[in-house]
Structures are given as C-alpha cells and as structure tokens.
Regions:
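Class I S-adenosyl-L-methionine-dependent methyltransferase module
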Residues: 127-135
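Conserved SAM-binding loop
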Residues: 122
Length: 135
C-alpha cells in the first residue's frame, strides 16, 4: 500500500530563524508534510478533535542536530496523527528526536538518515532514552 497525502502543517519558530540567502528571505516556519496509510476522508486528530494546521515551536532543540525540533512539537504531531502501537515514519531522522518520542509514546517507528555521523548520534540518543528497546 502507498501513503496518501493528508495535509501540510506550519511549524512556526520563535527563535533561531534562518535567512535563505539566494532569495534574501528570513524563514520563520517549517512545513511539516503529513501522509497517512489506511485512513481517508475527514481529517481529524486521533483524539477525535479538529486538527490545528499551524502551531508555534517555542524551543528548537539543536543538541542532536542543527535543524532539530523540540520534543514537545514532535510529541504533538505524533499524538495528533497516530495511536499507540501504530507506525511513525521519519524519512529525515536527523538527531533521532522523532524516534525517541515515538518510542516514549508507545509507537513503532522507522527513521531514515543517510549521514553516518547522525546515524551514530541517533543510536546514542535511543540508548539514552528511558523507554527504548533498540533494534
């Protein structure tokens, strides 16, 4: 089965914004593309409430990756779009925040990262996480 496009969410950053040099634009938000498998029709969060398609990321956690997201933003997305025991996919895993939060919220997870340096950081972050059994 394939994934179906669901929506795009705007994640606004309150600090650490970047200038896109080629266009001379200060970028204050990041698009989060949401895809789903096996769900169609009306968009609802897994809690049954209406989904909010923009929210503020008050803290950008750059400890694990230079473009890292705070755990609270990742937790909001995971809990909005998945239930416990469902699968979460992060195709650009970076420092592994999504994988750690997915495990801590009882989700299965797959992370993809091509940079070997960050693959090792992900492994270390997963080992430090309090509720993670790895591999």
């Amino acid at each position: 089965k394939h994934l179906d496009y669901c929506w795009v969410i705007s994640l606004y950053h309150t600090e650490n914004t970047q200038v896109v040099h080629a266009r001379n634009v200060v970028c204050t938000w990041k698009p989060i593309l949401v895809f789903r498998k096996g769900r169609s029709g009306k968009i609802e969060s897994c809690s049954g409430h209406a989904m909010v398609d923009s929210f503020r990321n008050d803290y950008r956690d750059k400890e694990f990756h230079e473009w890292g997201q705070g755990e609270s933003a990742v937790k909001y997305l995971i809990e909005t779009f998945s239930n416990p025991d469902e699968l979460v996919l992060d195709p650009m895993a970076g420092g592994g925040t999504t994988l750690v939060v997915a495990k801590e919220t009882k989700r299965k997870c797959i992370g993809i990262e091509i940079d070997p340096v960050y693959v090792e950081k992900i492994k270390a972050n997963l080992m430090k996480s309090k509720s993670v059994s790895m591999f």
